[in-house]
Amino acid sequence: MIAYDKIRPAIVRGLADYLGVQIIRGNQSAEAPRYPYGTYNITTIAGANNGTRQQHADGIDRLMVRSIWSFSFLSADYDESIILAVKAREWFEHTGRNWLAEHGVVAQSTTDITNRDNILTVEYERKNGFDVVFYVYDEVQNLAETNGYIEGADITPERTN
């Protein structure tokens, strides 16, 4: 299982602390916070990985999978939205790498920053954003029975004529 209950708060807290704005999950029906703020949506929870699980001494088998998150930064001010998006992408690409690694997350790549403006009745909501591809572990307990030793046997090759 992917530990989203630990990964999600670590990513959101680290990014929010760096930017100094609130980061919320997008596409909710609750009232939005005051500008500026950021949103995230997990667009791909666990991308396919045709590899095999790694067996570890702690009894946990791990498979590295890709998780894709979309980040957008909203403001009433166009420039502020762009600046937040640029700073956020820089955090994922460089400044925040140690923070993420300490929480078991690797930001593998980021996409271009693109305009995502919305029109709200008579005015625009300025929004710019990008996607981040994370590497995360899908972990499962290894339930294989082991008895702590490997039985050996003497094998003598037979000769055929």
Which positions does each model-derived feature cover?
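Residue-level signal for secondary-structure boundary sites
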Residues: 48, 79, 138-142
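Short amphipathic alpha-helices in soluble, non-transmembrane regions
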Residues: 84-90, 148
